[in-house]
Amino acid sequence: MPLHERCFASVASSFTRGRLERGTIVPLRVELKPFERIVIGEAVLVNSGTRISFLIDGEAPILRERDTINAETANTPAKRLYLCVQTMYLKNDIPRYRTAYQGFLRELRETNPGARVTIDAANAHVATGALYKALKEIRKLVKREDELLAA
């Protein structure tokens, strides 16, 4: 059975029972606008024209391009930490980047002591391997830095 049929079959059979069973992984439905990009692991998928929708079955690190930061734009403490965690997430390799992460974390704590709760929440997510959740927390700090720099 092709992948897309398996995805629809697994979702349909789960919902016909009225609920998702514990431990069932539901495929991720992704919609892309024309020419929008999405990063899956180390690959970038580019929508070539019309609006599309597809399912991703399995576990893979996924980020929309608008949620990524590159080395050139990582010019603040929060952005440097975000880039480091983003790299850990997309490459699925926490140990390799742990030393850099700890340095960026220390820098952010020193420059932004008022954000301790958010920084600690992000750090707790990294400690448990929940890197996507850590990115969501760090995004709050990036947004706050951008607001302060714009003022």
What positions do the PLM features span?
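Terminal leader/tail segments of proteins
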Residues: 2-151
